[in-house]
Amino acid sequence: RVLHKSSLPIEVTQEIFDRAHKSGNYVQTYKTVDIVTKRHTKELDYYVERSHMTYKLTRRISDCLDSEPQKVILIHLEDDGKLKRFQKANAAWAKGKCNSFFSCKEYLEYCPVDTDKGTGAQYLVKLLNIPHTSTVAIGDEQNDIPMIQSAHIGIAMKNGIDDIKKA
């Protein structure tokens, strides 16, 4: 059951795709239960193998989507620096349009503005009427930082990235 849904405008999704392709990065989004992307690559194979999802290839992403997606993911399997450079180069454009973070070193995700694990956790706390003092969050990656910061008790996994250990 979906408790709350936020989505990226299709124009923003298309722009992320255009910018990713210009920079030579693989990028994908989702239509219901399918991955939607422009080309078949090793990154797509990697993701399909782990997610067991089906995929659709299309020339123009906005032509394939009949509703706004919840996220867009750029994937690079060999050089996470390339994704970091992309994120930095597009930060000014993305400001106020979407939120970006790494869910692992290979995945740079773009989601609706003000949408992250922290806002999701806060939504649940309010919906379920849980006292803030009863909240605990555990994480290991960059995308977990807002959740850990929003909880009363935040725990970083031993194998977590350095930034989460500082949060």
Regions found by a protein language model. Give the residues of each.
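Alpha-helical substrate-recognition element adjacent to the catalytic core
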Residues: 1-13, 17
